[in-house]
Amino acid sequence: MKKIFYNASLPRSGSTLLQNVLAQNPDIYATPTSGLSTLLQSAKETYSKRAEFAALDTALMKKAFLGFLRGGMEGFTNNLSDKKYILDKSFNWGGDYYLLKYMFNGESPKIIMMVRDLRESVASMESQYRFSPQHVYPKIDLETTQLTTLEKRLKYWAVSNPFGLTLDFIKEIFTAKIENEIFFIKFEEFCAFPEPVMKGLYNYLEIPYFAHDFDNIEQVTDQNDGFYIFNHKIRKQLKPVEPKALDILGPEACNWVYTNYEWFFKKFNYAL
């Protein structure tokens, strides 16, 4: 079976950029946003709820179901690419640590999580909303005034998938004290010091290092952004990004994000 790694990064924090940098390595197939985790969760839900499984020998069904999960993942990834390593990108992997460990006989999965100053992540979402007026944001309802202001959108994003859910996954990782099993990357450090960050990542993945070209990043992850609210286009050159949150959100909204997620800012050493 191929080696599979999992990119479970925070939304609007550079996960697509990271995929395309790593895709420069000829041994790595980096996916666009993937539904593989969703397939596993759907199978898990069916297995847990259906009487056809519950009524049979528990030990036998457990063995068979584990084989189904592993075999399904193997078949899926083998048909994606002939390359040695698969880097599958989904926000949902952040909540799948224990499932993946269960599937592979106690072996800890290699999960990468890119994080960013939350004010900048939220500002990126708000910017996408404002500057894509041709798209109808699916949750906005003019009749009920749902999500018709920045304040309402902030509160919605904070408790919804994928942004709020990924933050919950991150918080649970620290609560469960498994943060040392996850490779966290600060987006700001990745942009400013990409080579040492990548060397640390390769060391975590336990694969041979590849010298990347951070000045000429080709976008090879191909997906139809018409199915998503936000686009996934990347910059060709990796360099620090100027902060925009204060200009886009204003001080009140920035303070709201900090106050409600102070634990995050402290865990990852982001200043007020």
Residue ranges and their predicted role:
Residues 12, 191-192, 251:
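Short, solvent-exposed loop/helix junctions and linker helices
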Residues 6-8, 185-190, 246:
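Short, well-ordered beta-strand elements within core beta-sheets of diverse protein domains
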Residues 1-74, 80, 224:
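PAPS-dependent sulfotransferase catalytic core
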Residues 64-86, 155-170:
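Alpha-helix-centered segments that form part of catalytic cores
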Residues 88-212, 226-229, 233:
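PAPS-dependent sulfotransferase catalytic domain
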Residues 19, 97, 198, 254, ...:
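Generic structural marker for isolated residues within well-ordered, non-membrane alpha-helices
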Residues 4-5, 84-85, 110:
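Short active-site oxyanion
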Residues 1-5, 174-175, 203-272:
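PAPS-dependent sulfotransferases, especially Golgi type II membrane carbohydrate sulfotransferases
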